[in-house]
């Protein structure tokens, strides 16, 4: 399949064959094709497979070994050297402990965002530099561009796969040293390229969920590290209608897994989580996916991370932009104002199931400005 792609290092005066790029090889199709495209453009390409989870779990071990074998097969096919590295200690200290602390506080964190900031674009980048890399590359569906001397993060071309949401906490210095070879390609084309070149990963299923949980049930996994804290499920009026095993097992907007079924004297409509009351250990549920208590107009965040501080809005006056409060959500118009080192975002339209612990990520057009962890929500 012929594909025209602009050079990946347009601002680097060196020819491609003098530039070393180390690709983060996950054993999936996206990183495989990223390595292939770099190789085709003449870069000196190497791969690195990182192991970020060391807990003794048979299923996870088998998955990691399969991924490593697939990464090795692709590198052999492309005639590039594959390094391996174990970053499990750094992952535990900088990602997993935060994940547990957030769940203890009954919030719903996004460890993938922290993994990108702390591991893939920090530990991996530093390690690759020691191996002689001029740049690292990953299989993320996102792009970068230059503006006024700054490296900006842009959405990937494929709207169904854009991963800028997960990268908003990374800094511009890291992006300046990173290449995203498939950012201008749509996923079906990536698979077609891999199949045409005979890469073993061409039809491999995309990984989903949190990397260290794998295919296990989330509740079973969490119980391994955090003790259950049973409490009661109540409706919006405080009437008890069931029991829960722990607020940490539930998230705002959740429908499945509540275990309350039909409630005598109530309609058959499904129940949804509307609130988690930490002080009383009560899980508040409401009926109907459009119940008013599931919606909010405003959120506040923790410390705001602007990818390009020099280009960031001062917020000395209200700033208009779009936002996502979860991955794959269509962008929503909002107005930002300063709130300490965070922001207050007021949305034009009520937003459903905005969840403390998740991230609000802000955009201007296809430029990702940055984001922050959601602290509170409010209904006007």
Swiss-Prot record:
Localization: Cytoplasm
Gene3D superfamilies: Adenine nucleotide alpha hydrolases-like domains, HUPs, Translation factors
A single MF term (Gene Ontology): ATP binding
EC number(s) per entry: 2.8.1.13
Active site per UniProt: 115 (nucleophile), 211 (cysteine persulfide intermediate)
Matching HAMAP family: tRNA_thiouridyl_MnmA
Name of the featured protein: tRNA-specific 2-thiouridylase MnmA
């Amino acid at each position: 399949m012929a594909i025209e792609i602009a050079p990946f290092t347009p601002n680097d005066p060196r020819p491609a064959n003098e530039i070393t790029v180390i690709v983060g090889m996950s054993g999936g199709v996206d990183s495989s094709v990223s390595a292939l495209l770099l190789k085709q453009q003449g870069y000196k390409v190497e791969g690195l497979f990182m192991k970020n989870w060391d807990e003794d779990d048979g299923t996870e071990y088998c998955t990691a070994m399969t991924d490593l074998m697939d990464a090795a097969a692709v590198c052999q096919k492309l005639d590039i050297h594959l390094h391996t590295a174990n970053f499990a200690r750094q992952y535990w200290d900088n990602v997993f402990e935060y994940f547990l602390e957030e769940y203890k506080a009954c919030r719903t964190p996004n460890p993938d965002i922290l993994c990108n900031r702390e591991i893939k674009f920090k530990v991996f980048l530093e390690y690759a530099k020691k191996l002689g890399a001029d740049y690292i590359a990953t299989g993320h569906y996102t792009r970068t561009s230059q503006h006024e001397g700054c490296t900006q993060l842009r959405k990937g071309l494929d709207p169904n796969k854009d991963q800028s949401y997960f990268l908003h906490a990374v800094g511009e210095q890291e992006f300046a040293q990173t290449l995203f070879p498939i950012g201008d390609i749509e996923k079906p084309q990536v698979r077609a390229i891999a199949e045409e070149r005979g890469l073993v990963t061409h039809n491999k299923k995309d990984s989903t969920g949190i990397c260290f949980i794998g295919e296990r049930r989330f509740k079973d996994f969490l119980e391994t590290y955090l003790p259950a804290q049973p409490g009661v499920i109540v409706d919006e009026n405080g009437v008890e209608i069931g029991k829960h095993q722990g607020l940490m097992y539930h998230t705002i907007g959740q429908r499945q897994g509540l275990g309350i079924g039909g409630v005598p004297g109530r309609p058959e409509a499904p129940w949804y989580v509307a609130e988690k009351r930490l002080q009383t250990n009560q899980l508040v549920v409401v009926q109907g996916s459009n119940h008013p208590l599931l919606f909010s107009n405003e959120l506040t965040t923790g410390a705001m991370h602007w990818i390009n501080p020099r280009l960031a809005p001062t917020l000395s006056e209200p700033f208009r932009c779009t936002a996502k409060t979860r991955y794959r959500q269509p962008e929503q118009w909002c107005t930002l104002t300063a709130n300490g080192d965070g922001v207050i975002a007021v949305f034009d339209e009520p937003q459903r199931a905005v969840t403390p612990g998740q991230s609000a990520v802000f955009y201007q057009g296809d430029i990702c400005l940055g984001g922050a962890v959601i602290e509170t929500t409010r209904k006007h």
